[in-house]
Amino acid sequence: MPAFITFIGNKLSNSATAFYQKNFGVNVTEWRIISQLAIEPGIPASRICQVIGFDKGPVSRNLAALQKRGLLTIRTAPDDGRTHSITLTARGRAIHDKVIVAALERERRLLSCLRKDEREVLIDLLRRLHENLGAVTGQSTS
């Protein structure tokens, strides 16, 4: 089953990258970061890594690229230089507001083969699996 979930995830991620890049100029990792910042404005990079499940290196590179394009601002603590607050700019929020419409439509099309009750069961099962990831990763998922 983990392989099957991975296959589905890879295909979704690859097609999302191509779609988001072509239509909005962002890759799927950038979209995940933008999306998380829309949900939790002002969070540090460590929180982004924790939520999207990526290592610090790829997240840092994507944050730098998004900052360079004017989609977010990164504030650092004056005493130690570490990042403590990342927020979307107005331009970043505008990209988010466009991409979220397309992302929700992609989700709707993907799940269209399931009845409403099946979608609810699927979401419940995926949440439970996510909460239990620590059983195989040794890490917290919160």
Q: Which sequence ranges carry the predicted segments?
A:
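Short capping segments at the starts of secondary-structure elements
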Residues: E40-P44
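Short glycine/proline-centered loop/turn elements that form peptide/ligand docking sites
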Residues: N23-N27, P58-R61, A65, R115
